[in-house]
Amino acid sequence: MQEPELSVIIPVMNIENRICDVLNTLKEDTKDISVEFLIIDRGSKDKTMQMALRFLRQNQLNGYVMQESGGNVSQVLNAGIQYANGTYITFVFPQRIYQSYLEEFLKKAKETNAEFLFGCKRQEQLKFADLRSTSSVIKQLTGVDYIKCMITHSIIPDAGAVVVSNRFLQNHKIWFNENSTYCYGEDFVYKCFLAANHLAQVAVVMQVDDEKSVLQNQNHTSQDIFAPFEEVECLLRTLVFLQRQYSHHEKMIKLFMQQKIPETIMQIIDGLLKQKVKPRAIRSYMHKKGYDRLLIIGPYTPHTLKAKITTWRYFPKFYRFV
């Protein structure tokens, strides 16, 4: 049997009422592509697996339904990579399904033999994305350049918005970090950008389709209210990796320390405050873990972020009004 052009890895859990909608969307988006669907269940207690299997059979689609009970999302995605037979791989997260992009990505992959493909965040980026792939005059950006763009929000750092060569992942032994519940996708994208020799930005604006995405509860119990700070731990591991392997890229390291990490911490603080967690409790936890020392301000810290950090640090009672 000829290997498919694309393996679509879909981690699912307890979405029996929407799984067929998700698969139907993907069926329409890949109707002109040789594709296999790898639906990996994380231990659903409903009929998600049965519904998915029935959909594949009724529509005569190439694919498998597997169960990885007890595994986190990273473990499920890694299992998908191991089973994937496609020349290229993409990851689809039901809670954020992007508007049709796979056909354009596969077309670009064939034209360029790119190892890692990603889209555009804004309309004005489309022209340059096209020019970079066709013109030798336009500056070709490196993986380090694109990581800087990720940190400054110029591109989307989402593993659910990329297409990557299967062989590239196997050759470079790139996997999702199974020790992290947060930030695993971003960490994966960093690794791909840094390892790939052939990158391609596709002239497609990546937009989440809210109607087709599956709304899932993300509520945390009181005992793990500070669990989002795991994302900071993941970023610290990434920082250590960058410092060891790419210390000569000083601007990227400083952007990571002076913008990425502080910004992430402040976003976590905002989320906790919205959940009515007391500022004193947050500050106490941060001090205990040493996260307060990571709120570094420097030349690469945006002005608005400086204001947020300063207010939180010295005037926490007024922080909600920043």
Predicted regions and their residues:
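Donor-binding/catalytic cores of nucleotide-activated saccharide
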Residues: 73, 96-202, 207-226
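Cell-envelope/extracellular polymer assembly enzymes that use nucleotide-activated donors
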Residues: 5-7, 36, 187
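Short aromatic/hydrophobic "clamp" motif used to bind/position activated sugar donors
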Residues: 89
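Glycine-rich, basic loop-to-helix element that forms the pyrophosphate-binding segment
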Residues: 68-84
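Membrane-interface aromatic/basic loop that binds lipid-linked glycans or pyrophosphate carriers
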Residues: 111-114, 272-322
